[in-house]
Amino acid sequence: MRKVRRVLTGAGRALSPRQMRDENGLLVGWGLGTAVFPAVMFQGQARALLRRDRTGLVELGAQDMGQGAWTALAQIAADSLGLELEKLEFQSGSSDLPDAGIAGGSSHTATAGMAIHSAGAEVIAKLAELAMGDERSPLFGAGNAGVLARGGRLYRRDDESRGESYADILARAGFAEIEGRGSAGGDPFAQKPYAMYAHGAVFAEVKVDPELGQIRPTRLVGAFAAGTIINPRLVRSQYYGGMI
């Protein structure tokens, strides 16, 4: 509603047509359109690897048709492994890699992203198990308190002053790397007990020359609920492209 107020300012609009004009005599109209689209998740897989040299690798057969999917998926991959983006090697776009589902139906980020997240979570769980079971680790015995992964290190959730690097954990355990695999989605067409949709609204102000019939949109405002936004710049560009 805050978006509505920004557009529909003033003393209010007349309900009958052709009642509003601007200072140049052009007819002014206001309109509202709603948007709804199913939030679908298909089946997909991904593979993640954490190396002793403090780098990570994520592999999946996801496609990018120019919508910026690889950028968003690489961000999810780095976050799932608790690494900076520049420390991550992201491999995608090959049928030799794990099948990450189709790039369509506004489902790709959710499908491939969930597979990546699951693969990264498995890597971190294996790493945490090594540390929490090692008496030489400051994470020893963390147990139910658990750990969190950030910046190439694991920390105790109940005391973030206690932690150590991935490299130290792997070196002490004698591992060069740890691998995890993840999957996403079931049958997208199976009957579900609930529905998931992205939704939104677009508000428009349009001016019409009553003599020439020329139509010119002068203001557009969109408000959308599309779940967690991974890359705001990418999403903003897609919104602009769809509206304009």
List the model feature ranges, each with a label.
Residues M1-R6, G10-I244:
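Cofactor-binding beta-sheet edge motifs in enzyme active sites
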